Curated annotation (Swiss-Prot):
Part of the 50S ribosomal subunit; part of the 5S rRNA/L5/L18/L25 subcomplex. Contacts the 5S rRNA. Binds to the 5S rRNA independently of L5 and L18. It comes from Symbiobacterium thermophilum (strain DSM 24528 / JCM 14929 / IAM 14863 / T). The gene is rplY1. Keywords: Ribonucleoprotein, Ribosomal protein, RNA-binding, rRNA-binding. It comes from the Bacteria. One of its GO terms (cellular component) is cytosolic large ribosomal subunit. Belongs to the bacterial ribosomal protein bL25 family. CTC subfamily. This is Large ribosomal subunit protein bL25A. It holds the Pfam family Ribosomal_L25p. GO terms for molecular function: 5S rRNA binding; structural constituent of ribosome. The lineage of its organism: Bacteria, Bacillati, Bacillota, Clostridia, Eubacteriales. GO terms for biological process: translation. This is one of the proteins that binds to the 5S RNA in the ribosome where it forms part of the central protuberance.
Length: 205
């Protein structure tokens, strides 16, 4: 389980002009919603939100400390909107969760073993960066791992090869391609021959 992150928030006025003023003042307008929850328009500090997303991604349980409320709201980031030119976050949707109930959200795919595949003469082309999962908020993984260190032949690697931790269900179609391995110049045989030649060459006397 990931550590629960902390985020400051305050209620805000709605409307495009109010949102524009908030962004100029260093805040991101957003909303908290969820099953049985009255939607609440909020704003969060831009720097704090950007740092949280950059360091931890979107797949984390967050304690949103809304100004004036005694207890934090347990939320996850459901959607981020970014400026097409600056990539700065312009709006954020938070889903308020019950830690005892499962939720669906998107987390990144972490590929390991890519260097081994490249040493075998394979070119790795990434097709899918994130995957939708279902789990309890307390079991959200940082990422879903895909290990391709054992791939020796060209071809697609699909969602079926993802290693989901206990308590996490991957919702994507198992046949969806995550990445493709193709032969580089010289192919697998030449790369293996070069590797063997390199390992058999000892240090100069």
């Amino acid at each position: 389980m990931n550590a629960v992150l902390q985020l400051e928030a305050r209620t805000r006025e709605t409307g495009s002009r109010a949102s524009r003023r908030l962004r100029q003042a260093g805040f991101v307008p957003g909303i908290i919603y969820g099953p049985g929850v009255e939607p609440l328009a909020i704003s969060v500090p831009t720097i704090q939100l950007e740092r949280l997303v950059d360091r931890h991604g979107r797949g984390h349980l967050i304690n949103a400390h809304v100004e004036g409320e005694a207890n934090p709201r347990q939320v996850v980031i459901k959607q981020l909107q970014r400026d097409v030119l600056t990539a700065q976050v312009t709006h954020v949707d938070f889903l308020q969760v019950d830690i005892h109930r499962t939720i669906t959200l998107t987390v990144p795919i972490a590929v390991v073993g890519e260097e081994q595949a490249k040493r075998r003469g394979l070119i790795v082309t990434h097709e899918l960066a994130e995957v939708e999962i279902k789990c309890r908020p307390t079991e959200i993984p940082e990422a879903i791992t895909l290990d391709i260190s054992g791939v020796t032949e060209p071809g697609p690697v699909t969602v079926a090869s993802l290693a989901a931790p206990p308590g996490v269900e991957v919702l994507e179609d198992p046949d969806t391609v995550v990445l493709s391995c193709t032969l580089g110049f010289g192919g697998v045989e030449e790369a293996e021959a070069e590797a063997e030649a390199g390992s058999s060459t000892g240090p100069a006397a």
